[in-house]
């Protein structure tokens, strides 16, 4: 049986091109400006998370969705997960899922991070390697993993979330 990519609902907090880091306050049901990036850098893709997951850093599992155009905070995108970036942020593992919109025909053939232009992967890695430099915080970029590893990571984060409930 052939592998099928995971399809998830990505809850977007930060649109592509933004320098503002928004976070959703679940208790109050509002988006709050967490901070403006200290560095003159911009988010290279839609940035959000998967609801009902718990990553190793204690937050929901992060996801970047590569889109044709920016969306808005609160947008939910049906997303085909194509891999993830291993990284460490302030000493904690902080994987970043990578996906593409199911409902955009420009990405119909994209099933793996290998289907993206290598330059796009370099942009994403560079952003996360440098975006906290002027805050004096360190991040470390690890390896890229494919869709099968991403599916396993999602399942682990769902199980961790369910154990914490």
Swiss-Prot record:
GO terms for cellular component: cytoplasm. It is found in: Cytoplasm. Disulfide bonds: none annotated. Pfam families: Pyrophosphatase. Substrate binds at residues 21, 35, 47, 131. Homohexamer. Catalyzes the hydrolysis of inorganic pyrophosphate (PPi) forming two phosphate ions. Belongs to the PPase family. This is Inorganic pyrophosphatase.
């Amino acid at each position: 049986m052939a592998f099928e990519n995971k399809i998830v609902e990505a809850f977007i907090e930060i649109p592509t091109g933004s320098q503002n880091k928004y976070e959703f306050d679940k208790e109050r049901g509002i988006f709050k400006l967490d901070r403006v990036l200290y560095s003159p850098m911009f988010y290279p893709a839609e940035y959000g998370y998967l609801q009902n997951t718990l990553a190793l850093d204690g937050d929901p599992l992060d996801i970047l969705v590569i889109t044709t155009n920016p969306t808005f905070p609160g947008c939910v995108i049906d997303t085909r997960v194509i891999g993830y970036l291993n990284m460490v942020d302030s000493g904690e593992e902080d994987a970043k899922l990578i996906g593409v919109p199911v409902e955009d025909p420009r990405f119909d053939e994209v099933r793996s991070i290998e289907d993206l232009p290598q330059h796009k992967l370099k942009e994403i890695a560079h952003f996360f390697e440098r975006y906290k430099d002027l805050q004096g915080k360190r991040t470390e970029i690890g390896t890229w993993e494919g869709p099968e590893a991403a599916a396993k990571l999602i399942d682990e984060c769902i199980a961790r979330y369910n154990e914490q409930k």
